[in-house]
C-alpha cells in the first residue's frame, strides 16, 4: 500500500495546530503497519532545526501557476520510519508566519499542483493521496479535471480528503480559477466550488475526493447539521455515503509520563502517587500555594470562544471562592487574555495565567493538574483531553465532537468512566459538573480509580491507523 499524505504542516517540521500533530503521528503509525507512506509539506522558513539538518536536496522543476512558471525544489529526509518531501519556493514560503497572507490562494494553488508534478518528477506512484484541510482542497480537483485526463500515470490514484476544522474553508475570488489553475468558470457556475461569491478550496476537496474523513464519529454527524456545518452541511449531507468519522489518537512515544523529559518526576499507572510530586513542583514554579491536596484545575488551549472561554469567565469568580487552584496556558483573544491576567493579580496564589505557548510548561501542567477543562463550543476531535488521560489528569468536557467520543462520564456507583461531561453550552452546567468533580475528588479511593481508568484508556494512533489502513485498502481494492 503506497500512500502520499499531503498537508500544509507536520510535526516535528512545523506545527501551528492539531493538523501538525496528526500529520506527524498518523504516517508514523501507518509505517509501523508496513504501509509505504510518504508525507509532503511546504518548506517554510521556520522549519524545526531538529529535522532541517537531515534534509537532502533531490531535484528541482518548474510548476505552472496560471501563465507563469514557478521554481520548485524537492528536499527529502527519512524520519520516524517515514519519507518526508519538503517543497521549496522561497517567494511563497520563506516568511515569518505559516498562514494569513494576502496571496494564500496562490501559495497553496502552487503547492497543490507542485505535489502532483513532483510524483511524475520522482517517478513514484502512490495508490492513494490523502489530503488535509482547505490548503490541499484543490488537489483532488486538479487530479480529476487535468492530471487524470492528460496522463495515464495518475489514472489509478484515489483521493481521501480529511476535515480537521470545517470553520477554515479557504474562500477566494472566483477569478483564481482561470488565473491560477487555468480552468474556465464552469466549475464555479455549476456550484461545486462556489461558496457565496467566492471559490472554496475546502468545497473542492469535499466534492471531488473519493472518500471524506473527519476526526471523530460525533463530528462527522455534527457537520451535517446547520449548527456545526458552517454552511457546508448541505454538501456533506449529499455526500454522507462517502463520509467517515475516525477519531484521532496521540503519539504515545511523545506523550508518556514514564519518559517525559520536561516533568520533575516520571511516573506510570503503577506509581500514581509520584504524580503529586509534579503537582507540588509546579505550584512552586508558578507561585501557587504548595499543597498537594488542593485540587488543581487547568487549561492548555487557545483562548477563544470556540474553546468555551466565555463559560469559564462567567463562573471564574464564583469558582475561585472554593479551595481550588486554576492554571491557564495559552494565547488568543485579547479580552480573554486580559481577564485571566486580572484573575492572576486578584487571586495571587490561587491562579496562574501564562499567556504564551510553551511545550515544556504544557507537559508539566498535564502531569501536575488534577482536572483538565475543555468546555468547548465545538471540538472536531481535541488532543488536550487525550493527553490529559495519558497523564492521569481527569478531563471535564462538554459533550461535543471528539470530546463526546473519547470521554465517558464517571459513574460513582459502578466505578466506570474516565472523566466528567456536561451537555448544554451553559455556564451553570459547567460549574455544576466541576462541583461534582470536586466532591468525587474528596474520596481518594474513587479518585484513584478514576485516574486508573483514565490512564488505561487506549487513545494511541495504533488503533486509528488500522481503521485508516482498512479504509485505504477498501478504496483501492487491495487486501
From Swiss-Prot:
Pathway: Glycan biosynthesis; glycogen biosynthesis
UniProt keyword annotation of Transferase present: yes
Entries under CDD domains matching the protein: GT5_Glycogen_synthase_DULL1-like
Keyword Transmembrane helix carried by entry: no
GO molecular function annotation: alpha-1,4-glucan glucosyltransferase (ADP-glucose donor) activity; alpha-1,4-glucan glucosyltransferase (UDP-glucose donor) activity
Catalytic activity: [(1->4)-alpha-D-glucosyl](n) + ADP-alpha-D-glucose = [(1->4)-alpha-D-glucosyl](n+1) + ADP + H(+)
Segments passing through the bilayer: none
Keyword vocabulary terms for this entry: Glycogen biosynthesis, Glycosyltransferase, Transferase
EC number: 2.4.1.21
Residue numbers binding ADP-alpha-D-glucose: 15
GO BP term (any one): glycogen biosynthetic process
Family, similarity comment: Belongs to the glycosyltransferase 1 family. Bacterial/plant glycogen synthase subfamily.
Function: Synthesizes alpha-1,4-glucan chains using ADP-glucose.
PANTHER family: ALPHA AMYLASE DOMAIN-CONTAINING PROTEIN, GRANULE-BOUND STARCH SYNTHASE 1, CHLOROPLASTIC/AMYLOPLASTIC
Protein name: Glycogen synthase
Species of provenance: Clostridium beijerinckii (strain ATCC 51743 / NCIMB 8052)
Gene that produces this protein: glgA
